[in-house]
Design a protein with these regions (language model features):
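Histidine-dependent nucleotide/RNA phosphoesterase domain, centered on the 2H-phosphoesterase fold
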Residues: 1-221
Length: 221
């Protein structure tokens, strides 16, 4: 995916939410029960390696000095959402035809080779802070192939929106930002978190915050 396209995407998120952030943002009421959240989803995702995670954690340490009361994701929950196959719904259970989904996803993964994702900079919405990710075309190919194959096989796809980014959500807002101007200054500074080679992806049944998860399959590329 071209860098300019993703730059525009991440920039537009921040621009659209700037005034909301300055006004304190819009808190996520569900965060009070993040550990027991039962809005479960079937997803394909990418876990983040330790070297990039360490750099992100150092950034989080700095963020805590500005906004100490945010919900900060632990390193083991850092992820790139490749595809929300079945969206997060309260009390959702693993579907009885899960093996059909797994076979479909596994077949699509065989059509791509390992690819790179570069983590460069931050962006933010009115209730979340994200690391910007820039990916090779292989990820775009996989996403479209999976959409097509699920449709061909009559399997439901509940993508909340057409996924085009490769961001990592690292923090979420409980109630109100305490220092929104300082936060925006921090987010807009240049920072590089490194590049990872994606050689495997994960099929997971997890909740909104990834605090409850069941790994259903590991896809080796």
């Amino acid at each position: 995916m071209k860098r300019a396209f993703l730059d525009n995407h991440y920039d537009s998120i921040l621009t659209a939410n700037r005034e909301k952030i300055l006004a304190g943002g819009n808190g996520d009421a569900f965060l009070e029960k993040a550990l027991t959240d039962s809005r479960m989803a079937l997803v394909v995702l990418i876990r983040i390696p330790s070297d990039a995670a360490e750099k992100i954690n150092r950034c989080i340490d700095d963020l805590k000095g500005i906004e100490p009361n945010l919900y900060y994701y632990p390193a083991e929950d850092f992820q790139i959402t490749v595809m929300d196959v079945l969206k997060g719904e309260e009390g959702r259970r693993i579907p009885p035809n899960i093996n059909e989904y797994i076979r479909c996803i596994e077949e699509c993964s065989k059509d791509i080779s390992p690819f790179k994702v570069k983590f460069d900079g931050l962006t933010a919405s009115d209730n979340a802070i994200m690391v910007r990710g820039y990916y090779d075309d292989q990820l775009m190919v996989f996403r479209q192939n999976l959409r097509d194959m699920l449709k061909q096989r009559g399997l439901s796809l509940e993508e909340r929106y057409k996924t085009i980014s490769s961001h990592i959500t690292i923090a979420r807002l409980h109630s109100k930002f305490q220092n929104p101007e300082k936060l925006l200054d921090f987010i807009e500074k240049s920072r590089l978190f490194g590049t990872m080679t994606v050689s495997k992806m994960e099929i997971s049944f997890h909740n909104w915050y990834d605090t409850k998860k069941e790994v259903l399959s590991i896809l080796e590329l």
